[in-house]
Structure formats: C-alpha cells, structure tokens
Amino acid sequence: MKAFRVHTGIVAPLVRPNVDTDQIIPKQFLKRIERTGFGPFLFFDWRFDEAGNPKSDFVLNQSGYKGASILVGGKNFGCGSSREHAPWAIEDFGFRVVIAPTFADIFHNNCRNSGVLAIVTSQENVDAIAARAEKNPGYQLTVDLEKGTISGADGLSIDFEVDGFTRRCFLEGLDDIGLTLRHADAIADYEKAHA
C-alpha cells in the first residue's frame, strides 16, 4: 500500500445518502480476480447511459472534476454488500480520500485495506466542502493525515481524527499483508520450532 501523509487534490461532490456498493461497482463487473482494473466501472450505471455514452449531468463526467482524487459523499456511504471491489474501484479510478458523515463499517475497513483514506466528519463540514466544489469545479483540498486537517486555499479548515491503527497503517503504507510481513522472522522461527 502506498504511504499517505499529505494529499492535495480536486474534490468531486457526490453527496447522496446511502450510496451502496452495488452503485459504486455494479455486480456485472465483479468477475476479475485482480485488485486493479475496476476504475472504469466506478458508478457505471450513474456515469453512462444504456448505450455506454457518458451522462453529462453526472459529476465525474464534468470537466471541472476530471482527475478528482477526493470524493465527498453522503451519510452511510458504502452500505450494502461487503465487497472489496467497491474501494478497489474508487482507488483505481484515482481517489485517495473519501469524506462523508458516516460510512458502512465493512466498507470503511475495506477502504483502509485498499489504501483509500475514509474520513468521517460532520454533515455540516461535508455540506461546506460540497458547496465549494459545486460552486467552483476544480476546487482543491489538502488532507494532512499527520496534522489531522483538511484545508482549502480559501481558508476552509477542518480537523479530523482517524483511529491510531488506521493512522499508522496509512503513514507507514501498511496493509494487512504488510503488517504480517513485519513479523516474518517471528513467523519463520515459530514454523521452525513447530515443524
């Protein structure tokens, strides 16, 4: 997993409540066994019409949000089935951060394991960020994990917290496999002793 300390990026506002994993990555795209290649299918049914043409009214199809790497969502973001493919698609599309008032628990954990920083903040803060991004497409924020701040050049400043374990994993670039590999010598010693 790529380490995360400070990230500056364009904000894409998608403040809809109860965005579920079926909307994030529809089931017909779940046949891959790799973690990559899901980005083109992110929000597929919202991004494209039945003929496969981009819907111009969907935020990620609008020019001001091209290259966005910070997604702002509504409450209960990532609800539904527990598929890991949803944060894989978000990460593969280019998002490093998702900000919402609440997340489904399993989705939140899957984000950590996928290298997507899921930040919980108040609805008021989400609305303030979304309003700025909607008014000024291309609006950028800086997320500083070490300081626990979200800031904009316009003076917006929001403090946030993530649990210590998640913070450590992101700062050090450790997913579950990376954490396990830190104990490779102890594991090898145990296996030798119990062979």
From Swiss-Prot:
One of its GO terms (cellular component) is 3-isopropylmalate dehydratase complex. Pathway: Amino-acid biosynthesis; L-leucine biosynthesis; L-leucine from 3-methyl-2-oxobutanoate: step 2/4. GO terms for molecular function: 3-isopropylmalate dehydratase activity. It catalyses: (2R,3S)-3-isopropylmalate = (2S)-2-isopropylmalate. Its EC number is 4.2.1.33. Keywords: Amino-acid biosynthesis, Branched-chain amino acid biosynthesis, Leucine biosynthesis, Lyase. Heterodimer of LeuC and LeuD. PANTHER family: 3-ISOPROPYLMALATE DEHYDRATASE SMALL SUBUNIT, 3-ISOPROPYLMALATE DEHYDRATASE SMALL SUBUNIT 2-RELATED-RELATED. HAMAP family: LeuD_type1 (MF_01031). This is 3-isopropylmalate dehydratase small subunit. It comes from Koribacter versatilis (strain Ellin345).
